[in-house]
Amino acid sequence: MFLEAAIALLALLLALLCRPWRMLGSRAGPGGMQDPVLSPLLTPLLAVLVLLPWVWALPELHKMPLQLHWSGAPLVLLLIGWPLAVPVLIATSAIAYALAPALGLQDALGMAVWQGLVPATLAMLWGAAVRRWCWHNIFVFIFLRGFLGTVLCVFVASLLGQWAGHVLPNVNDELSRMARWLMAWSDGVTTGMLTAVFVVFRPHWVATWSDAIYLQPPGNPES
């Protein structure tokens, strides 16, 4: 529990140093600052706070032989960025703790770290590497960041959580790794699909997306 608390506090401190609330400020509208518009990131942020706590609490609201958890943290990272994702994921865990009476405080803290903060942080680092060393186009963003990156980040984070003591009850290590691998793929498929939809139809909801970077003309040598 002390490891999870230290990770959560460190991540929250670093995120707050980035002043993430600036991303939610009003912006100049068609009439300039006299006609401000709300930040487009408010929509995905509120959607995460409404939907994701139920997803995290669901395994504790019913009794199943194999309790599997869906993360969603890489998707949150793609939508609102790491500085905002950190407090939002911690709040998600707190809401899930309130929704599920069977969820203990230690389990809720572990959920915040190993289901939320760690995969989101790994996804941020993966995204920085992809932007630095891979081609800049829409397919690379959707496939490497939305799909493949999510699979790898969620799986690695779940293995780290297992190493830290958050194991699946009544399941041996080999079967547990297989279950976590399969759940990472479900995370990847869902995140990749939603990333593709949002990038095409609601790009202003995706904080990590940039038309200037990923929609360069085909003849540009930097593409």
Task: Name the predicted role of every residue range.
Residues 14-22, 96-161:
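Short helix-perturbing small/polar motifs within transmembrane alpha-helices
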Residues 8-16, 74, 78, 116-127, ...:
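Hydrophobic cores of alpha-helical transmembrane segments in multi-pass inner/ER membrane proteins
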Residues 32-36, 136-138, 204-209:
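Flexible, glycine/charged-enriched surface loops at secondary-structure junctions
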Residues 1-4, 34-39, 106-111, 176-180:
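Interfacial loop-to-helix junctions that mark the boundaries of transmembrane helices
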Residues 1-76:
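Hydrophobic transmembrane alpha-helices
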Residues 198, 202-223:
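Short, highly charged, low-complexity non-transmembrane loops/tails of multi-pass membrane proteins
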Residues 1-6, 130-201:
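Membrane-embedded alpha-helical hairpins and interfacial helices in multi-pass inner-membrane proteins
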